[in-house]
Amino acid sequence: MHNKRKVIATLTTIPSRMEHVHVTIESILNQTIKPDEVVLSIPTHSIREEKDYELSDEVKKLSDEGKITLLHCDEDYGPATKILGVLKREIDLDYTEDREPIIITFDDDKRYNADTITNLLSSDLIECGVVVCRKGSRIYMVDEDHPFHTDKNNGILERIYSGADESSVKRVDVLFGTGAVAYRPSYFDHDVFDYKSENEDFPEVSAFFVDDIFLSGYLSEKGIGIVVASFDKSPLQDKMATHVLDVNTQNSNVQPLGTINRTTPELGKETIKYFDKAYNNQM
């Protein structure tokens, strides 16, 4: 619990990463602020890999011991399943505003620093009605005649912020799911589960792979701010490269989403341009 709020940690994975996802789960279970529930949200069938899920022995053991909740989702929302699976369960529950839970999402290819949840919650920024993350970025759109415009970036520039390198809270446009992110259910409406149905121009296929950009743009439209919390580096983080907060697991080399985003950059660009009001800072 944190400020009398239940803390729900949640992540998703793909079938090819099931074998090693327990490493990430164990790092979540070993946080200095213990989550009240750790949820592995998975659909029956993976759209990305076109195959059904089969639980690993390690995940079965964690579930059988009551250490995690297996949440079987009706739909595959891609990487966003980590938030949308739990959100679908929580969004209609009768919470008062000061008692609704905190949902913290994690990626499936990191061994998270033990103070990750502390980094997100210790400043109580979550009580201000904002999304809190450890990493994020600001997006800048520039015209073709701008000196920073290139054919490669298509006029979309990004500045990354890591809470371990900042002395104060920073407002950002894009949350980085890799660093873990804290939300409250009231930040969302039901349209997040089928955004395309009410927004026919929404690039649904592209957004499936760039959940950070979709969720950030969606939240901006709802008037929800996103901030990067400031925190002290751990001794291990002090030895890491710039913007690196957590150690990769073996899953970082298994079907990495970053490869898809690098080889098909139009996925992110299409989604950014759809939410252009959220991503239109001036330089």
Per-segment meaning from a language model:
Residues 2-7, 20-24, 190-283:
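C-terminal catalytic/acceptor-binding lobe
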Residues 5-8, 29-40, 67-69, 101:
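Short loop->beta transition adjacent to catalytic acidic/histidine clusters or analogous donor-positioning motifs
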Residues 11-22, 33:
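Active-site beta-to-alpha loop of glycosyltransferases that engages the nucleotide-sugar donor
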Residues 11-13, 42-44, 133, 230:
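Short beta-strand/turn micro-motifs composed of small residues
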Residues 24-37, 44-47, 60-61:
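Short, acidic, metal-binding catalytic loop of nucleotide-sugar glycosyltransferases
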Residues 43-100:
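Active-site-proximal specificity loops/subdomain of glycosyltransferases
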Residues 86, 111-199:
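Conserved catalytic core of nucleotide-sugar-dependent glycosyltransferases
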Residues 95-111:
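Short beta-strand-to-loop acidic/aromatic patch adjacent to the donor-nucleotide binding site
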